[in-house]
Design a protein with these regions (language model features):
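Short cytosolic helices in intracellular loops of multi-pass membrane proteins
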Residues: 80-84
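Aromatic-lined glycan-binding groove of carbohydrate-active enzymes
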Residues: 187, 191-215
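Alpha-helical transmembrane segments and their membrane-interface exit regions
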Residues: 49-57, 196-203
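Cytosolic-biased juxtamembrane loops and peripheral soluble domains of multi-pass membrane proteins
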Residues: 62-78, 100-126, 149-161, 204-245
């Protein structure tokens, strides 16, 4: 226990971050197990628990990326990679997620690879389908982004060297989901609902954090126009207030 505490960024992290990790892990296990139950009430509660535990796992990746859990980067990376398996973000690498996120902070920009405005402009039928599905709270836009992440080494040329790893993760996660779909279709559907609930929470919160315009410069670095511009950052950053009294 002493060794673990000494490895943490802050002593209270044992209970704060440790509690979050325990909740995400146990919540995922219990939530997933509850999807197999015969009771619809248990199914509904388990779906919500699973969605919430995956959401916490996703935010823990963010904390690990900023090295806020452990003192050493390699320990944060190990935890971040583990959490990426819980929230379905393991198709790409932890290092890629961290690099993209820090480009966002350093450049004061939304740095991306996929020109989605241009893509939707060229595919009006798909755009109408996405809008239709979004009306029913199916996060179709994010599912397209997730599809790109799942097949990242096949779609993004700069990630072709990750092909073996990418295929391995697809076979493991895709294989398990296919088995669920064939033998336990109810579980597969409820898992998909839980995953989409997580997507809704993450994108709603992200929407409130920043409203930077995006630039497709993830792999083609160009001098960001607002790097170091504190005024620009403040104009496009919205922190969550703790309360109206203590913003």
């Amino acid at each position: 226990m002493t060794t673990l505490v000494s490895a943490l960024k802050e002593p209270q992290g044992l209970w704060m971050n440790g509690g979050a990790v325990a909740y995400a892990t146990l919540g995922y296990i219990l939530g997933f197990a509850g999807l197999f139950h015969e009771s619809l009430v248990v199914n509904a509660a388990s779906t919500l628990l699973l969605a919430h535990s995956m959401t916490i796992a996703a935010y823990l990746i963010h904390e690990c990326g900023h090295n806020l859990v452990f003192k050493r980067s390699r320990h944060n990376a190990a935890l971040g990679r583990a959490m990426s398996w819980l929230c379905g973000a393991a198709y790409g690498t932890y290092e890629d997620m961290r690099y993209k996120h820090f480009r966002h902070h350093v450049d004061n920009d939304d740095v991306v690879w996929f020109e989605y405005d241009e893509f939707f402009g060229k595919h009006p039928v798909l755009t109408r389908a996405v809008k239709f599905l979004e009306w029913f709270y199916i996060p179709a836009h994010d599912l397209i982004m997730h599809f790109i992440m799942v097949f990242t080494s096949f779609i993004i040329p700069q990630r072709r060297d990750q092909r073996r790893r990418n295929v391995t993760v697809i076979l493991i996660r895709g294989g398990v989901f296919l088995l669920l779909l064939v033998y336990f279709p109810k579980v597969a559907v409820l898992y998909a609902i839980a995953y989409m609930l997580m997507m809704h929470v993450l994108r709603f919160m992200d929407m409130l954090q920043h409203d930077y315009p995006y630039n497709a410069t993830l792999f083609e670095y160009k001098d960001p126009p607002h790097k170091g511009d504190a005024k620009w950052e403040q104009e496009h950053t919205f922190s969550n207030p703790v309360s109206l009294r203590y913003p």
